[in-house]
């Protein structure tokens, strides 16, 4: 009944290395896309939000500045959390902001 034992020395190490490299590349690509998407969203929205973020409360609340607002009464404190860029998850609408 020795046939049930496995000999792990016959496993090809090249296939394990190749699998690890593929997984690492996929995870790195996802992280890079998330970071670049978040940075692009900040720069895109920041140019529309300079007057509101400074603290001019008389202006329309969160008109184009949803990522920088709490949507309560205080527009000076930033909202916490990380927004998922829309090009990574195109089918899900997880963001609170309205599309332009």
Swiss-Prot record:
Q: Does the keyword Transport apply?
A: yes
Superkingdom, taxonomy of origin: Viruses
Query: Which organism was this protein described from?
Result: Influenza B virus (strain B/Singapore/222/1979)
What name does UniProt use for this protein?
A: Glycoprotein NB
Q: How does it sit in the bilayer? A: Single-pass type III membrane protein
Segments on the Virion surface side according to the record's topology features: 1-18
Task: State the family named in the UniProt similarity comment for this chain.
Answer: Belongs to the influenza viruses type B glycoprotein NB family.
Which GO terms fall under biological process for this protein? proton transmembrane transport
Q: Name one Pfam family in it.
A: NB
Instruction: Tell me the gene name.
Output: NB
Q: Which residues lie on this side of the membrane: Intravirion?
A: 41-100
Complexes and interactors? Dimer.
Q: Where in the cell is it found?
A: Virion membrane
Q: Which residues are glycosylated?
A: 3, 7
InterPro entries registered for this protein in UniProt: InfluenzaB_glycoprotein_NB
The role this protein plays is: Putative viral proton channel. May play a role in virus entry.
